[in-house]
A protein has these predicted regions:
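Short alpha-helical "recognition helix" segments of helix-turn-helix
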Residues: 348-351
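Residue-level signal for the short linker/turn that defines the boundary of a DNA-recognition helix
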Residues: 343-344
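C-terminal accessory regions
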Residues: 179-210, 216-222, 227-302
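Short, Lys/Arg-enriched anionic-surface-contact patches
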Residues: 311-334
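Conserved helicase/translocase motor-coupling segment
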Residues: 81-208, 212
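Conserved helicase motor core of SF1/SF2 NTP-dependent helicases
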Residues: 1-77, 87-98, 102-105, 114-126, ...
Length: 370
């Protein structure tokens, strides 16, 4: 296709962003790097603010860990103050599905949501394994299991051992979803489908859900990121592995860059995905996490701990219990209400404020007069 384009007898202009190359797994190539045209920089964006531009720029500088010297100039000229269109963006299908489940279970009054792309695809891992395969294995219905790997397992215990041996993040998440919700899963998925609006009614959605691949080119007033992207600490660990794939790691950086630049106004981002030297601003909200990623934890352990509800609180429950009885200030109340209005899960707010989930719910009940 590129060859056909280049051979046209006309003035030719290629417009793109090298750092938004995220489809290498589909064997997509970056056309900008395969031509010798004169290069003109478009370094200003009128979508997002200077603070978001600085964040995005510093994320791209992580490519130095891959031996690159990114020559990037990025300026934010956006002045949007609207906060109507809200989106949750994840790196993986299952990370997004977990957040969507949390959202509708915690917000019973939500009537309309929207998924970019096919909703059914979010129940699958990248390798094709289905959430229903794991559920059928747990229920002893192996005849209904289609995935060849899961079909080899005689029980959930075998699957759990396989996950530990292979460090399969997405399969680990599937197993934990099944453990958490069990036979309630079909009803939950049906609830998601019932609330999902058609394309022409997307403007009615109270929350839009998307993986970063599906929302490339999109923009939203407010964006919250699920904590399943690769941060700098994890990137440095992955670079040092014997089987490290520089092109894949380059795309992992690009994925986070694309995700943070979807916002027109507010961005809620876990602190372990924030480069050093970046602090919160009125539009950039840094969500505290349990702790920075540690080399001693496997990817599966980190991913599972990022999503599960009460399980994520075990390591800090004693300290959180102490904090639950400390005085709330006007500033903290305002931040809590804003995060709740944005649809941030109670689990995430609990970690951010270092309080129990019960303490968060109790405070919200008082502030909202429920």
């Amino acid at each position: 296709m590129l060859d056909v384009f280049i051979r046209q007898q006309a003035t030719k202009i290629l417009v793109g962003d090298t750092h938004q190359q995220i489809y290498g797994w589909r064997n997509a190539v970056n056309s900008l790097e395969n031509t010798d045209f004169q290069e003109l920089r478009l370094s200003a964006s009128f979508r997002f603010s200077p603070q978001i531009a600085t964040l995005a720029h510093k994320i791209l500088l992580w490519k130095k860990h891959l031996g690159q010297e990114p020559d990037v100039k990025l300026f934010g000229r956006g002045k949007n103050t609207a906060n109507k269109v809200k989106a949750t963006i994840a790196r993986t299908n299952l990370g997004l599905l977990l957040r969507a489940i949390e959202f509708i279970k915690e917000n019973k009054n939500i009537k309309h949501i929207y998924f970019e792309g096919n909703l059914n695809s979010y129940t699958y891992a990248d390798d094709g394994a289905s959430l229903y395969d794991v559920l059928n294995l747990q229920n002893g219905k192996k005849r209904l299991v289609r995935d060849p790997i899961i079909k080899q397992m005689s029980s959930v215990d075998d699957l759990e051992e396989y996950i530990k041996q292979t460090d399969d993040v997405q399969l680990g998440l599937m197993l934990e979803i099944v453990k958490e919700y069990g036979n309630e899963i079909p009803k939950i998925l049906q609830d998601l489908k019932d609330k999902h609006v058609a394309n022409e009614d997307k403007h009615k959605a109270q929350m839009i859900f998307s993986t970063v691949h599906r929302c490339k080119g999109m923009e939203y007033d407010s964006v919250q990121l699920v904590n399943d992207f690769v941060g700098e600490e994890r990137l440095k660990v992955m670079v040092d592995k014997d089987d490290a794939d520089p092109s894949r790691l380059n795309e992992e950086i690009n994925l986070l860059y694309v995700a943070v630049t979807r916002t027109r106004n507010h961005l809620y981002i876990p602190e372990n995905l924030v480069p050093d030297g970046i602090g919160p601003t009125p539009s950039l909200h840094i969500l505290k996490t349990e702790k920075k990623e540690k080399d001693s934890n496997t990817e599966t352990d980190r991913a599972i701990r990022s999503y599960l509800k009460e399980k994520t609180q075990r390591s800090s429950v004693n300290e959180a219990s102490k904090q639950s009885y400390q005085k709330w200030t006007k500033e903290l109340d305002a931040e809590l209400l804003q995060m709740h209005d944005e649809g941030i899960p109670t689990r995430v707010m609990s970690t951010h404020f270092n309080r129990t989930t019960g303490g968060i719910r109790s405070r919200l009940k008082k502030l909202n007069g429920w």
